[in-house]
């Protein structure tokens, strides 16, 4: 790829150059590591001193930050790429460089792969060594499936999707266009469905066949070792644009709305519906059969046990960390809260002169709770 100029990058990303539009941009780097040929970015005004001290050939900034730099008299003699959202601009420029560095023009089927005779594999696809594609599977144009991946019977893979090594896509599952499935991801394994049969000697669990599918929309990314289970009867659905991190558990019949992001080790129990544009922190967990409103933010480690109906809320259930000794003292206080409440109720009764009014006890407790 020919080295792009700052002016070309501005045109591609709807940005404006202040400085030399002919500057050749050879790479991207953080502010403190960038050199004269590198492009860096400033997305937080707190790092303005680092931007001014950087040796970067150019820095992506917002219009407001450029005005601050000009007010300090330090804009002249440097190159700035002015974008409405510097972080997004940086991401798109990074995609450009990543495509060039990792361009994979390979096509065809590796002789060590096993592809069913009736599977549909366009000539533009690349199928790596030891890949297994079962009967009836259908691939779109330019799909790339790397070593040791498994595509089950009658599965569908959309165009321009990249499936890394050791991914498993079970039978009849649907993967949309431009998806990225990272190594170890499992799409469409059986959901955790069992019917308890209580007998005289105990409980036996009878397996419920999971006959639904896992269906992923377009532009979805699934992290390493993440599991998206197939539905029990209806489908498990991940809508367009969702980004799911590593080691996340999506249980059967879950529905995740478009452009929701879920960080690592989160777990969503069966039949829960998460809305659009939600942000789910790492290690958050959801009980089953809940409805989560659009644009909900859930902090890392939070346990959601009830539905959230109001859009745009931010929810947290984890105490910030403290020293171990302080945590132990706080834990002791929490353990004593029920006794403390009883004492408060008694003191309130005394204050109102109600010590000898047992008929009011229940009402008093309800008012205090």
Swiss-Prot record:
The keyword Transit peptide does not apply. Gene3D superfamilies: Hexapeptide repeat proteins (2.160.10.10), MurE/MurF, N-terminal domain (3.40.1390.10). It holds the Pfam family Hexapep. The active site is at residue 252. Disulfide bonds: none annotated. Residues 348-369 are annotated as: Disordered. One of its GO terms (molecular function) is N-acyltransferase activity. PROSITE patterns: HEXAPEP_TRANSFERASES. CDD domains: LbH_LpxD. InterPro entries: Hexapep, Hexapep_transf_CS, LpxD, Trimer_LpxA-like_sf, UDP_GlcNAc_AcTrfase_non-rep. GO terms for biological process: lipid A biosynthetic process. Keywords: Acyltransferase, Lipid A biosynthesis, Lipid biosynthesis, Lipid metabolism, Repeat, Transferase. It comes from the Bacteria. It catalyses: a UDP-3-O-[(3R)-3-hydroxyacyl]-alpha-D-glucosamine + a (3R)-hydroxyacyl-[ACP] = a UDP-2-N,3-O-bis[(3R)-3-hydroxyacyl]-alpha-D-glucosamine + holo-[ACP] + H(+). The keyword Repeat applies. Pathway: Bacterial outer membrane biogenesis; LPS lipid A biosynthesis. HAMAP family: LpxD. Homotrimer. Belongs to the transferase hexapeptide repeat family. LpxD subfamily. Catalyzes the N-acylation of UDP-3-O-acylglucosamine using 3-hydroxyacyl-ACP as the acyl donor. Is involved in the biosynthesis of lipid A, a phosphorylated glycolipid that anchors the lipopolysaccharide to the outer membrane of the cell. NCBIfam families: lipid_A_lpxD (TIGR01853), PRK00892.1 (NF002060). PANTHER family: UDP-3-O-ACYLGLUCOSAMINE N-ACYLTRANSFERASE, UDP-3-O-ACYLGLUCOSAMINE N-ACYLTRANSFERASE 1, MITOCHONDRIAL-RELATED. This is UDP-3-O-acylglucosamine N-acyltransferase. The lineage of its organism: Bacteria, Pseudomonadati, Pseudomonadota, Betaproteobacteria, Burkholderiales.
């Amino acid at each position: 790829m020919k080295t792009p100029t700052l002016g070309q990058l501005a045109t591609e990303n709807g940005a404006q150059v202040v400085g030399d539009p002919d500057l050749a941009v050879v790479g991207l780097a953080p502010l403190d590591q960038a050199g004269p040929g590198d492009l860096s970015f400033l997305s937080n005004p707190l790092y303005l001193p680092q931007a001014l001290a950087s040796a970067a050939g150019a820095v992506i900034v917002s219009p407001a930050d450029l005005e601050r730099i000009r007010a300090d008299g330090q804009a002249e003699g440097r190159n700035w790429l002015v974008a409405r959202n510097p972080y997004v601009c940086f991401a798109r420029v990074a995609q450009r460089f990543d495509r060039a560095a990792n361009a994979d023009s390979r096509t065809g089927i590796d002789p060590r792969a096993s592809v069913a005779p009736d599977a549909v594999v366009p000539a533009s696809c690349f199928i790596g060594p030891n890949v297994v594609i079962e009967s009836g599977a259908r691939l779109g144009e330019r799909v790339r499936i790397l070593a040791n991946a498994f595509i089950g019977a009658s599965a569908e893979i959309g165009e321009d999707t990249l499936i890394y090594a050791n991914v498993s896509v079970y039978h009849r599952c649907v993967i949309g266009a431009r998806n990225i499935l990272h190594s170890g991801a499992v799409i469409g394994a059986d959901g955790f469905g069992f019917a308890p049969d209580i007998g005289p000697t105990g409980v036996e669990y009878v397996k419920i066949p999971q006959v639904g599918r896992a269906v992923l929309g377009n532009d979805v990314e699934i992290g390493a070792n993440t599991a998206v289970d197939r539905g029990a009867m209806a489908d498990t659905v991940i809508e367009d644009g969702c980004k799911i991190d590593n080691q996340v558990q999506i249980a059967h019949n879950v529905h995740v709305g478009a452009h929701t992001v879920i960080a690592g080790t989160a777990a969503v129990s069966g039949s829960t519906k998460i809305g659009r544009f939600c942000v789910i922190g790492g290690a958050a967990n959801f009980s089953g059969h809940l409805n989560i409103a659009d644009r909900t933010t859930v902090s890392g480690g939070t346990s959601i046990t009830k539905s959230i109906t109001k859009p745009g809320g931010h929810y947290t259930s984890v105490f910030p960390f403290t020293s171990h000794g302080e945590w132990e003292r706080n834990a002791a206080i929490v353990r004593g809260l029920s006794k403390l409440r009883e004492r408060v109720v008694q003191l309130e009764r005394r204050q109102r002169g109600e010590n000898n009014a047992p008929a009011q006890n229940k009402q008093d407790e309800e008012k205090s709770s």
